[in-house]
Amino acid sequence: MTENEQIFWNRVLELAQSQLKQATYEFFVHDARLIKVDNHVATIFLDQMKELFWEKNLKDVILTAGFEVYNAQIAVDYVYEEDLIIEQQHQGQQGYTEQAFQQLPAVQSDLNPKYSFDNFIQGDENRWAVAASIAVANTPGTTYNPLFIWGGPGLGKTHLLNAIGNSVLLENPNARIKYITAENFINEFVVHIRLDTMDELKEKFRNLDLLLIDDIQSLAKKTLSGTQEEFFNTFNALHNNNKQIVLTSDRTPDHLNDLEDRLVTRFKWGLTVNITPPDFETRVAILTNKIQEYNFIFPQDTIEYLAGQFDSNVRDLEGALKDISLVANFKQIDTITVDIAAEAIRARKQDGPKMTVIPIEEIQAQVGKFYGVTVKEIKATKRTQDIVLARQVAMFLAREMTDNSLPKIGKEFGGRDHSTVLHAYNKIKNMIGQDESLRIEIETIKNKIK
């Protein structure tokens, strides 16, 4: 990269970072690379699914940087992984092609090609799991073996498993890789037992370079001791030959109660990492990414509203977008307002429809009356102990009892940021679990509001 190219690219990144939220920047911009600037055309390498975001949101950034560095209007040519690899192959370098993929008849990897590290949204709740997964993909069998990823459903464990496999396969098309759920491993074991072909099963799994097992907790069943024995031997064969093993579970190794102790011990030989539900910023980034797949306009307040409604896992967010798409297509509308989104997701919300008819002002008034403070004080910045508690309780109830997004709630509390509302909500939620008197106070206020 020439000096001007480096200056230009640094300026693009600087401007992008100043305009985007951190989680959005990390996902859409961080991994992009400038290949060259030639004849006033910047060639930028990025994941293909991110091109639309760049076209919509970063065109002005590139124009600004272009005029600053080259005193010219810079056009953009986006190239994707496939383009670069084809170019490398023409230069005699090793690369991944569909033909190379098909030259591995001995092992069907069963990887899902749509999952990669590039399209995995990172946040504080999964950063260590992502870092460990990338480390394993870069040096399989040497860094963390096994890698054990645990967390609730819909948080990205399967995505990371496939991303590891796809990354390894990209670097080494001849790698023997197998992705399989523990349930399917059990099914294969039963079939081979019935057919008296256990040697085939052993050859299939014990000669792998990378074994990716999803939902290993399914193996923890006392009635399947024979399956545990086979997996134990498979694990040993791979580990002894420095072949990488990655496991996912909905619980820690120590909580796999029906699994043999010798397996649990081996699962803890390497690294155990946890994935927790995404925070608000990460959910916004996930939605910003996912809506690129839909031909609708999602205003920012709608995105933030949706991010505030589902805080347990990514699947709920994906399901909500499908519900919205169905309603929007039926009504033949292009722009998804908060009202349309609320109507579409009402049946999906785990706790049922919230009481959208309750004004936030009513909540503030009842909370203020209970704690002896005014609504004006609740909305202001004064931080005496009684006012702070009343303010946080009011925010908590606004989140619990209405469909309003976190930013909308913050606006009703003197223009506060959504992160302040989220902090108040989490704080009161935790306090309720520890302070019975506070729980009773809040229930009393809720009954008055209803």
From Swiss-Prot:
Give the residue ranges for region: Domain II: 84-109
Check the record and name the InterPro entries matching this protein.
AAA+_ATPase, Chromosome_initiator_DnaA, Chromosome_initiator_DnaA-like, Chromosome_initiator_DnaA_CS, DnaA_C, DnaA_dom, P-loop_NTPase, Trp_repressor/repl_initiator
BP terms from Gene Ontology: DNA replication initiation; regulation of DNA replication
Arranged from A to Z, the UniProt key words for this protein are:
ATP-binding, Cytoplasm, DNA replication, DNA-binding, Lipid-binding, Nucleotide-binding
Q: Residue ranges of region Domain I, interacts with DnaA modulators?
A: 1-84
Q: Regarding domains, what does the record say? A: Domain I is involved in oligomerization and binding regulators, domain II is flexibile and of varying length in different bacteria, domain III forms the AAA+ region, while domain IV binds dsDNA.
Q: What is the designated name of this protein?
A: Chromosomal replication initiator protein DnaA
From which source organism is this entry? Answer: Streptococcus equi subsp. zooepidemicus (strain MGCS10565)
What gene is this protein a product of?
dnaA
